[in-house]
């Protein structure tokens, strides 16, 4: 089946423009993307005209509450939209469709962004499209890297899933049974009072590079799924013994050297990433694929990419794909891109069907724009 992506091209135009708004967590992103007519390919790539982002950052040891995050988004959304349009050198009347994150995510921040999206759609009298946050990550990753039909490892603050495409759905082959990997890293960063700027997970990554002693932690893989709450509880307990009132010194049995905070970050990363590599490799075998695409904020972690690369090298013609922080970390351009793909196949939302949802499964989305 060949999908017609130009059925809804406006008369006299040879391209499409979409504005995307992302605000499912603490990052507010607005992006403008351009698709030329015809199917996207290696010779007809989507063009990123602007990709502006602002992050709500809290003090060390604190997370971000939905109410405060939503206030940040409301305060900044108009300025970010204006900046995105100015960077793209276009006006509102040039936009074909408004795209917004419909879920999953934090309720209050999502609601702040959808209000802005509805306002723009009515102000400029153009269609509006709700986008699944995960599908946005996948489609942007595929477009930027050129990955054809990879197994997708989606790792972020709110999601951890192993995904593969089949029959116009992104099927979930494995996922976390409790907390997401980004949540696990962020919460441990709060335990250690690690700064939240530019991001707690990034700061843990930098500390882990200085670690060299592996502290034993639970390793919880259950078939294709994994659990991280027990690992977090275990390493939190160790950290509180070391840096709390007890000031207990832990010694590495092999070297006789003291365990440091850097060693804890190193141990947490190595354990979590080993679990992710295991279930991803199992999915590759199941669908007979040799490509892995890593998306989501944690996907920019260099150690995760390195470990995945070591695994994929053992497979014939194995390839790993990942983007940099511009596209791995939550952004508006991925929402614009996925939303524009929906728009080009005639999928739009009526205003009364733009309600956000905190629970929005990846496999709920009908991927109409891909050939079956």
Swiss-Prot record:
Compartments in which it is found: Cytoplasm; Nucleus
Cofactor mode of binding and number, as noted: Binds 1 divalent metal cation per subunit.
One GO BP annotation of this record: positive regulation of transcription by RNA polymerase II
GO cellular component: chromatin; cytoplasm; EKC/KEOPS complex; nucleus
EC annotation from Swiss-Prot or TrEMBL: 2.3.1.234
PROSITE patterns to which the protein is assigned, alphabetical: GLYCOPROTEASE (PS01016)
UniProt-listed SUPFAM superfamilies: Actin-like ATPase domain
Pfam families reported for this sequence: TsaD
HAMAP family per UniProt: Kae1
NCBIfam families: arch_KAE1, gcp_kae1
Protein name: tRNA N6-adenosine threonylcarbamoyltransferase
Provenance organism: Candida albicans (strain SC5314 / ATCC MYA-2876) (Yeast)
UniProt lineage: Eukaryota, Fungi, Dikarya, Ascomycota, Saccharomycotina
């Amino acid at each position: 089946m060949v999908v017609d992506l130009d059925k809804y091209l406006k008369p006299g135009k040879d391209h499409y423009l979409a504005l995307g708004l992302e605000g499912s967590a603490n990052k507010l992103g607005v992006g403008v993307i351009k698709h030329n007519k015809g199917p996207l390919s290696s010779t007809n790539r989507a063009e990123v005209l602007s990709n502006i982002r602002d992050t709500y950052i809290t003090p060390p040891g604190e997370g971000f509450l939905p109410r405060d995050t939503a206030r940040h988004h409301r305060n900044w959304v108009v300025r970010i939209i204006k900046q995105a349009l100015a960077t793209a050198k276009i006006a509102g009347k040039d936009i074909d469709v408004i795209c917004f994150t419909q879920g999953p995510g934090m309720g209050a921040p999502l609601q702040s962004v959808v209000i802005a999206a509805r306002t723009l759609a009515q102000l400029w009298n153009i269609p509006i499209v709700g986008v699944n946050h995960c599908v946005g990550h996948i489609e942007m990753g595929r477009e930027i890297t050129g990955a054809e039909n990879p197994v997708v490892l989606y790792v972020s603050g709110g999601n951890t899933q192993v995904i593969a495409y089949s029959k116009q759905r992104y099927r979930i082959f494995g996922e976390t049974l409790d907390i997401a990997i980004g949540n696990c890293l962020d919460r441990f960063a709060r335990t250690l009072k690690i700064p939240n700027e530019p991001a707690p997970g990034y700061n843990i990554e930098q500390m882990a590079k200085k670690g060299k002693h592996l502290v034993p932690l639970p390793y919880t893989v259950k078939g294709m799924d994994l659990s991280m709450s027990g690992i977090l509880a275990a390493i939190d307990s160790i950290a509180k013994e070391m840096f709390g009132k007890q000031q207990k010194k832990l010694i590495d049995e092999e070297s006789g050297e003291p365990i440091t905070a850097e060693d804890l970050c190193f141990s947490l990363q190595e354990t979590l990433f080993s679990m992710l590599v295991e279930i991803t490799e199992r999915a590759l075998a199941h669908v007979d694929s040799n490509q892995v695409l890593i998306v989501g904020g944690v996907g920019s972690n260099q150690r995760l990419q390195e470990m995945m690369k070591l695994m994929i090298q053992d497979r014939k013609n194995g390839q790993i794909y990942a983007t940099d922080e511009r596209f791995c970390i939550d952004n508006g351009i991925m929402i614009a891109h996925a939303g524009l793909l929906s728009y080009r196949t005639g999928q739009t939302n009526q205003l009364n069907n733009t309600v956000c949802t905190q629970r929005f499964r990846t496999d709920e989305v009908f991927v109409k724009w891909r050939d079956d």
